[in-house]
Amino acid sequence: MSPKLQNKLYKKYPDLFIDRKEPVTKSCMCWGCDVGDGWFTLLNILCQSIADHVETLDKKKKIPSVKFLQVKEKFSLLRIYVENGDEIVNNMVNFAETMSGHICETCGVFGVNVGKTTGGWIKTLCKDCAKKENKGWKK
């Protein structure tokens, strides 16, 4: 993800990205959000949902701070590893990971023209972005 978009997430959700400045020996978040810009909106919505949920819970009882351990792409899908997430947070993350399979990682388009690249590194791309990257593509 571009530094500009990544920094928007860091600024808006500092608690989720609290380990971003830790060394590699302590956290994989030192690599940042290792995904394409097309998933920014999905990540932003996920972060806001988690923040809202944690705020609601925190009013009822003190809970450990939820934080991201790693945000990356793996086998064409968003992968997020979370610490201190309850069942609801884990379900939110699972939903976002599933949705990423229908959103172009490069441009963010959603829907019918989004598929997987073929050959080499598998990515979720729309037909147009796959063509620009000279990648094979299948629905």
Across the structure, where does each feature detected by a protein language model lie?
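Short, flexible, mixed-charge glycine/proline-rich loop motifs
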Residues: 72, 90-102, 114-120
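Short functional micro-motifs and their immediate structural scaffolds
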Residues: 109-115, 131-134
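Catalytic-core loop-and-flanking beta/alpha module that positions acidic residues
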Residues: 50, 72, 79, 98, ...
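Cysteine-rich micro-motifs
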Residues: 120-132
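Short intrinsically disordered terminal tails
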Residues: 1, 132-139
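Long, charged N-terminal interaction/targeting segments
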Residues: 1-90
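Residue-level signal for secondary-structure boundary elements
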Residues: 54-58, 62, 101-105, 134
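Short cysteine-rich clusters marking metal-coordination/redox-active sites
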Residues: 104-107, 126
